[in-house]
Regions:
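Acidic, metal-coordinating catalytic segment for phosphate/diphosphate chemistry
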Residues: 121-220
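DNA-contacting surface of Y-family translesion DNA polymerases
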Residues: 2-146
Length: 220
């Protein structure tokens, strides 16, 4: 296409915009007319509302730990940070997930993944963490040390979409949990990700993916 445009004396966007669209179509096919439209700032593709766009297939995060994870307590510290990250992205983009996937890589570099369907769509950090920990227990990961670990939210639906209530669901408790998560999201967006930490992250800042020098309370 570049060579054919040069043969027509077209070397700049301005020259392309001023060219004859019919001639461009004759020489380049339908792509020639499309290039002419783009050069003139016109995109013939229909405009879609964000709500009409299909949701992403998944939202996830993973990390390689600074040391091997050798027990459930190690995994919990790392998964808490990952669950907060994935939950924050779900809430920011306006989605909830119906499935949680746990992925791990052992110290001998073998990958494993396990999935769990949730009782109801969720973007709550606590529910993502609980699902990931349940998958850890079901997978019988130990005593094999883990080198890296990740959480992925699958089967996404818009957070505003209606869902059937569970007879045993504590809607008020979930609403309070979500408001707490949103408050933490807003604080971290304004003051930095380490402005508020959950207590567990302070026991092993490295596994909680918190840099000690970034937070005054963790400095020696």
């Amino acid at each position: 296409s570049v060579r054919q445009l040069e043969r027509l004396g077209i070397r700049t966007v301005g020259a392309l915009a001023a060219a004859d669209a019919d001639v461009l179509e004759q020489r380049l096919g339908k792509g020639g007319r499309l290039l002419h439209a783009y050069a003139n700032g016109y995109d013939p593709a229909p405009v879609h509302r964000i709500a009409d766009l299909p949701p992403p297939k998944s939202i996830g995060n993973s990390a390689t730990a600074p040391r091997d994870l050798i027990c459930e307590a190690d995994a919990r510290a790392a998964l808490l940070s990952l669950a907060e990250s994935v939950g924050a992205r779900l809430r920011l983009e306006g989605y909830q997930c119906r499935t949680v996937e746990l992925s791990v890589r052992t110290a001998d570099l073998h990958w494993r993944s396990h999935r769990m369907a949730l009782r109801h769509p969720s973007d709550l950090t606590s529910e993502l963490l609980d699902a990931a920990l349940a998958l850890c227990e079901q997978a019988h990961l130990w005593p094999d040390p883990l080198r890296s670990i990740g959480i992925r939210a699958l089967d996404l639906v818009p957070a505003c979409a209606p869902h059937q209530l569970d007879l045993f669901e504590d809607a008020e408790h979930r609403a309070r949990q979500r408001q707490l998560d949103i408050t933490l999201d807003n604080l971290r967006a304004r003051y930095g990700k380490t402005c508020v930490l959950r207590g567990r992250a302070c026991f092993d800042p490295a596994l909680g993916l918190v840099q000690r020098e970034e937070h005054a309370f963790l400095r020696k």
